Structures are given as structure tokens and as C-alpha cells.
Amino acid sequence: VLSANDKSNVKAAWGKVGNHAPEYGAEALERMFLSFPTTKTYFPHFDLSHGSSQVKAHGKKVADALTKAVGHLDDLPGALSDLSDLHAHKLRVDPVNFKLLSHCLLVTLAAHHPSDFTPAAHASLDKFLANVSTVLTSKYR
């Protein structure tokens, strides 16, 4: 459960991301593909090379979903219900991959905003991404 302080930290951090969200989403995906090559199996139809338009487009989808989640911190299940259905029933993504992408998102945010990536911000963003992952995997059961 996100505390009021966590919610404030997440909103502040995501506010600094601003218009860079799609770029950071794509960068996090690239990090994930390079660091955890098994994740590529979910994207056999993608050009996974650096700067790929397909990775950029999917990065934007990730960023848009996270932006929506930040706007609905008190109702993540409601805000992400359609994505949960998609990932559980159609795409059948292994739940561990959400944790891997979350880690890569944290690394990307820290790389771009080192002075803002305080221990408190890191902890709050980690909790937020864990909650998003939990919601996205909730319909696997």
C-alpha cells in the first residue's frame, strides 16, 4: 500500500519525467532486452535494435500506462484492468517480466535524474512499480 508520502514522491518523480516518458519507456525496454535476453521471446515480431521504431512505440505504451497509473494511485486495479486482462489472457506474459522491467525503469530514471533519485524517491517508485506489477498479474489466478 502506498502511503501519502509515497504518492507524493511518485507524482513528483513522474512530473519530472514529463514529456520524456515515451523515451524513458523505450530506454527501459532496451535495457531489459539487453540485461535479460529471455524477455525478447515476447517480441519475436519486433526489430529490437537500438532506436527501433517498434521498441519506441511499445515504450510509449508502457509510459502511457504508467502515466495513467500515476493519475489513479488510489484505484490502480480500475485504471489498469484492461491491461491486466491483455497481459494475463492474450499475451500470457510471465509475471517475473514485470519485475525485470520495473528494475530497468528504476535504473533509467536514476540515470536521467540522479539528483532527484533520492532514497525516499527510489523506495516510493519501487513500491509503486511493485503495485502496478501486482495489478497486472492479478488476473493470472
Swiss-Prot record:
Involved in oxygen transport from the lung to the various peripheral tissues. This is Hemoglobin subunit alpha. GO terms for molecular function: haptoglobin binding; heme binding; iron ion binding; organic acid binding; oxygen binding; oxygen carrier activity; peroxidase activity. One of its GO terms (biological process) is hydrogen peroxide catabolic process. It comes from the Eukaryota. Red blood cells. It comes from Hippopotamus amphibius (Hippopotamus). Gene3D superfamilies: Globins. Transmembrane segments: none annotated. The modification Phosphoserine is found at S3, S35, S49, S102, S124, S138. O2 binds at H58. The modification N6-succinyllysine is found at K7, K11, K16, K40. The modification Phosphothreonine is found at T108, T134, T137.
